[in-house]
């Protein structure tokens, strides 16, 4: 009889200890809550059905209510990255720090500059950055693409230099004198007007050279 009572008391004591530990554990768990701001053209009640709230890439997960609010329960102390998983909009992830006393501190997640702290208000308010794009927009043809192509630049730049350089030399006597002192060989610059006329109007007829023969060249010597 005594052994039965002793066994019963041990069972009751073990269950009570387990219940106390569970109570202490649940008392140290917290909730992450906030609100989602969508564009005015989108109905939140329909959008919320396919949206999920992920903490640390799915370690803890919550759902979005029809009024665009959310709450993730039973979250222990630590640092978490809050993300909104959906197929329609792009949201920036937010970092949330939960202290042992239950104090929530939210800030922007800056991977490139971790020392840069931009605090955010709590409860969270997440705004859509823009619609999600799964395809790259097709590039349109523009006239500037043709004008700045390498082939066009190779043709236009030398032509511009040929037209501007003689005018600059004629208007600046000092530059013209320096060019003459350099004793550079004179290069006949082509006439642009004549070149264009030959290109569009056809080439000018070639001049016939007079052929004269000597009197003694065609006769045989005797």
Swiss-Prot record:
Q: What Pfam families does the record point to?
A: EMC7_beta-sandw
InterPro entries, A to Z: EMC7, EMC7_beta_sandwich
- The primary location reported for this protein is membrane
Alphabetically ordered keywords of this record: Membrane, Signal, Transmembrane, Transmembrane helix
Q: What membrane topology does the annotation report for this chain?
A: Single-pass type I membrane protein
Return the GO cellular component terms, semicolon-separated: EMC complex
Q: Which residues lie on this side of the membrane: Cytoplasmic?
A: 167-222
Cellular compartment(s): Membrane
**Transmembrane segments in this chain: where?**
146-166
Q: Tell me the first and last residues of the signal peptide.
A: 1-16
Could you list which ranges are Extracellular topological domains? 17-145
What PANTHER family does the database record attribute to this sequence? ER MEMBRANE PROTEIN COMPLEX SUBUNIT 7
Spell out the family assignment given in the record's similarity comment.
Belongs to the EMC7 family.
Q: What is this protein called?
A: ER membrane protein complex subunit 7 homolog
Q: Which organism is it from?
A: Caenorhabditis elegans
Taxonomically, what lineage is the organism?
A: Eukaryota, Metazoa, Ecdysozoa, Nematoda, Chromadorea
């Amino acid at each position: 009889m005594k052994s039965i009572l002793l066994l019963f008391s041990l069972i009751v004591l073990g269950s009570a200890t387990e219940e106390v530990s569970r109570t202490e554990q649940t008392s140290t768990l917290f909730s992450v809550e906030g609100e989602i701001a969508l564009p005015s053209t989108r109905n939140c009640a329909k959008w919320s059905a396919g949206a999920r709230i992920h903490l640390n890439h799915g370690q803890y997960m919550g759902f979005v209510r029809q009024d665009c609010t959310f709450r993730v329960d039973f979250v222990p102390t630590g640092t978490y990255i809050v993300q909104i998983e959906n197929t329609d909009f792009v949201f920036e992830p937010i970092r949330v720090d939960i202290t042992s006393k239950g104090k929530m501190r939210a800030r922007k997640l800056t991977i490139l500059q971790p020392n840069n702290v931009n605090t955010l208000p709590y409860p969270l308010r997440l705004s859509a950055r823009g619609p999600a794009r799964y395809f790259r927009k097709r590039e349109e043809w523009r006239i500037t693409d043709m004008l700045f192509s390498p082939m066009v630049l190779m043709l236009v730049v030398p032509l511009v230099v040929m037209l501007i350089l003689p005018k600059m030399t004629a208007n600046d006597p000092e530059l013209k004198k320096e060019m003459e002192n350099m004793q550079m060989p004179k290069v006949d610059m082509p006439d642009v007007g004549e070149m264009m006329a030959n290109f569009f109007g056809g080439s000018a007829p070639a001049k016939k050279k007079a052929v004269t023969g000597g009197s003694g060249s065609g006769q045989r010597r005797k």
